[in-house]
Amino acid sequence: MAGVRQHGWRAIPAVCSEYGADTLPDRYRSDGRCLLFWQQAGISALKQELEVKTPYRAMNHPVIGVVTKADLASMEQISLVKSWLREAGAHNVLVTSAVNNNGVTELFALLHTEEGCC
């Protein structure tokens, strides 16, 4: 439009919870197919995130739940978090640990299938 000055800007997806907002752009895919993020969160934050009306919510897309840092948790804690992720809408729940490389290969394999593709 003539006479209108356009300012350059770039939208950065943010994950908001009761603990604050996470806006690190390298934690997200920006191709519109999938929003991947990792963040320490309790079930209240997960439920709150699903209730937020944003273009980044899951809607009718598949949801993958990932339990991270499994090497630091007990089996009871991992089981509890897996149930929270299922309650929050995750169809696939994977348990990972980067320290001993457990579950990482399975996560990447799932992300490269039609089932896991968002």
Swiss-Prot record:
Which BP terms in the Gene Ontology apply to this protein? biogenic amine metabolic process
- InterPro entries listed in its UniProt record: EutP_PduV, P-loop_NTPase
Q: Which gene encodes it?
A: yoeF
In its miscellaneous comment, the UniProt entry states: Encoded by the CP4-44 prophage.
Molecular function GO labels: ATP binding
Protein name per the record = Protein YoeF
Q: Tell me the Pfam families matching this sequence.
A: PduV-EutP
